[in-house]
Amino acid sequence: MDHSEVKFTNKTHDNILKMELYGHRNDLANAFLELQKNEEFIISFSKDTHIEITTKPISKGYTLEYVCKNIFQENIENVMAVGDSENDISMLSLVGYSYAMANSNKYVKIFAKYHTSAFDQEGVVMAIKDFLYRKSQK
């Protein structure tokens, strides 16, 4: 079976919220460009070998905003988010305290207000400590 073949369809199913494609980034590049033509989806590289496809408006940012507003009644400006992939951009661009991991690509880092170490270097722990410090200074 040839795993590099990708077939596209305009058929959608109302219950599908998320799909993922895995492969080499070069192999996925054509699929990425083709999928971006469909305005019903949010398409992003999650990792170099992984494309995430979600139905609009579903995204990490949308979900975080919904949870803050409807469950915790918290202003999103008071919330932190840590991310390292393109599928984190929607979340990083919404919160008041956004952290990009050191292993993030340059594009993701543009959307973060702050930066932290890589995941395997306790970057999440460092981001939480920084967030708590910044909140204590207000």
Spell out what each predicted region is.
Residues 1-91:
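Conserved acidic, metal-coordinating active-site core of Asp-based
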Residues 52-138:
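Mg2+-dependent phosphoryl-transfer enzymes with acidic/Ser/Thr/Gly-rich catalytic loops
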